[in-house]
Amino acid sequence: MIVLGIDPALGSLGWAVVAKDTAKLKYLASGIIKTNSKDEIHNRLAFINSTLEKVILEYQPNMAAIEETFVNTNSVTSLKLGYARGAIMSLIGRYNLDMREFKPNMVKKTVTGYGHAEKDQILHMIKLLLPGTSAITNSDEADAVAIAYTCHVMRV
């Protein structure tokens, strides 16, 4: 099974592809999709959609795992994040991928053993858990790897 993990965002979206071959997890790829905050929102969403579509076409995942979001005190920020999630979910649906959502605390607990772990702890643990991730330095990318890892570990 190949899982596409997604840390949804409008400005800096993290993605990662992790495969399971028999009992072993294998990191395949990851990256960041950055958009310019000065661009109009529909153009930013289109860029996220087209870039993530290239990832889907290249790696052919069976499932997408996406981090659930919380409602921010800033309603505009929450709304923009909702737009990004909608664009992502629409793409997932268009390619008929199974999808699972995970709460941030569940991802943190699965990867670090502690549901309130800091970003640097997640980054450290994914480097220990999945060979090939040592070059990752961006926390959004690390979160996406952690989300894909969690999806595999939870056996969903």
Curated annotation (Swiss-Prot):
GO biological process: DNA recombination; DNA repair
Binding site for Mg(2+) 1: D7, D140
Keyword terms: Cytoplasm, DNA damage, DNA recombination, DNA repair, DNA-binding, Endonuclease, Hydrolase, Magnesium, Metal-binding, Nuclease
Organism (species): Rickettsia felis (strain ATCC VR-1525 / URRWXCal2)
Name used for this protein in its record: Crossover junction endodeoxyribonuclease RuvC
InterPro entries, alphabetized: RNaseH-like_sf, RNaseH_sf, X-over_junc_endoDNase_Mg_BS, X-over_junc_endoDNase_RuvC
Catalytic residue positions: D7, E67, D140
Annotated gene: ruvC
HAMAP family on file: RuvC
Cofactors named for this entry: Mg(2+)
Protein residues bound to Mg(2+) 2: E67
Enzyme class: hydrolase
Reactions catalysed: Endonucleolytic cleavage at a junction such as a reciprocal single-stranded crossover between two homologous DNA duplexes (Holliday junction)
Lineage: superkingdom: Bacteria
